[in-house]
Amino acid sequence: MPRATNKPATRRRRKKILNKAKGYWGRRSKVYKVAKHAVEKGLQYAYRDRRQKKRRFRRLWITRINAATRQHDVSYSQFMGQYRKSDLDMNRKVLADLAVHDPDAFEQIVDHVME
């Protein structure tokens, strides 16, 4: 009796990996063994970077708010300390966006918070 290999499932599994490896360079996109390793590593990077993305954006927002508040002779930590005590309720993302795209509105916020 011949050996059963379940060829359709094997082909589907390999084709799925090779499709995910499209756009990779050289053997990474053509050879199953190499492509499988490259795809797994790519998925690991994607998982890690989805989490790092949140940290990086928070750092960017803090940097932008800090730069904008220092133009008004206030440090970031002083501003945020007073901001939490104030009646305003905006997150860092919105504050950073205002600091970059609408400096006049941000100046009013700084004045309101620091009074």
Curated annotation (Swiss-Prot):
Q: Which GO terms describe its biological process?
A: ribosomal large subunit assembly; translation
Offer a single GO CC term for the protein.
ribosome
UniProtKB keywords: Ribonucleoprotein, Ribosomal protein, RNA-binding, rRNA-binding
Calcium among the record's keywords? no
Q: Which domain of life is it from?
A: Bacteria
Q: Which GO terms describe its molecular function?
A: rRNA binding; structural constituent of ribosome
Task: Give the CDD domains listed for this entry.
Answer: Ribosomal_L20 (cd07026)
The similarity comment for this entry is: Belongs to the bacterial ribosomal protein bL20 family.
Q: Which HAMAP family match?
A: Ribosomal_bL20
Query: PANTHER family annotated for this entry?
Result: 39S RIBOSOMAL PROTEIN L20
NCBIfam families reported in the protein's UniProt record: rplT_bact
| Function, as annotated | Binds directly to 23S ribosomal RNA and is necessary for the in vitro assembly process of the 50S ribosomal subunit. It is not involved in the protein synthesizing functions of that subunit.
| Protein name from the UniProt record | Large ribosomal subunit protein bL20
